[in-house]
Curated annotation (Swiss-Prot):
One Gene Ontology CC term in the entry: nucleus
GO molecular function: beta-catenin binding; sequence-specific DNA binding
Species, as recorded: Xenopus tropicalis (Western clawed frog)
Gene3D superfamilies: High mobility group box domain
Subcellular location as annotated: Nucleus; Cytoplasm
Primary residence: nucleus
Protein name, entry field: Transcription factor Sox-3
Coiled coil: none
Entry text on domains: The 9aaTAD motif is a transactivation domain present in a large number of yeast and animal transcription factors.
Alphabetically ordered keywords of this record: Cytoplasm, Developmental protein, DNA-binding, Gastrulation, Nucleus, Repressor, Transcription, Transcription regulation
Gene from which this protein is expressed: sox3
Residue span of region Disordered: 1-41
Amino acid sequence: MYSMLDTDLKSPVQQSNAPNGGPGTPGGKGNASIPDQERVKRPMNAFMVWSRGQRRKMAQENPKMHNSEISKRLGADWKLLSDSEKRPFIDEAKRLRAVHMKEYPDYKYRPRRKTKTLLKKDKYSLPGNLLAPGVSPVASSVGVGQRIDTYAHMNGWTNGAYSLMQDQLGYSQHPGMNSPQMQQIQHRYDMGGLQYSPMMSSAQTYMNAAASTYSMSPAYNQQSSTVMSLGSMGSVVKSEPSSPPPAITSHTQRACLGDLRDMISMYLPPGGDASDPSSLQSSRLHSVHQHYQSAAGPNGTVPLTHI
């Protein structure tokens, strides 16, 4: 077995020393083969001596198996071997190391630089020209994060805009917000992201309080001023079409009825009742009859000015 290993190991050395001729020699390649000759391989260890024959045999048995899979299986088989089975390969590795030291006394192992790991580290770092001369990469990353947070708060929805709006309202609360009328209005929807104009909120409250009034009651004046001040603060009051509080309803209804009666009594003849529908109809007919009498000519005929 040792003689077979010696022949396998000596043949590559002889082949590497053979093409030393010039460019005119048939086997030599001239100066192109000098870097290959200067590179000296490391001596094989015990595992490499053992796996050399085993690798060739396994590759012949499994031609489609990848070389990495073969190496994994050979490493597992090598660990299963006992010390007595490993002894001849260990001795052969020692002999090859001694021969290598005699042939290359000035040999020094110089491993190649692993450029892949360096590329991975430099992949996520910015070039030096993009940064300011006095700014470190850590400080620049912190500045970028703060800038992103600043722009994220502008849209009003992300990054807890609801909690931000509530904090602002907590520090500057209007005294009118603690009134029972405003608590009844705000109990349904209070969202910090949307914003309505104060005119829209006051108009909605006005439509819910009194639909056909011409004068605003004192209670409504106080309520609308509170709503407008709340809208100017930036909060949202979305009032659905529901019944207003009972106290405000009775007060506004009385004011509305009084105003309507005053307006209707202006057009009724004296002695008429505004609540009587027959008197209303007769007053309308009487006013129409007077209109046509005033428009008639001296002969009692209506002038044909409309033709």
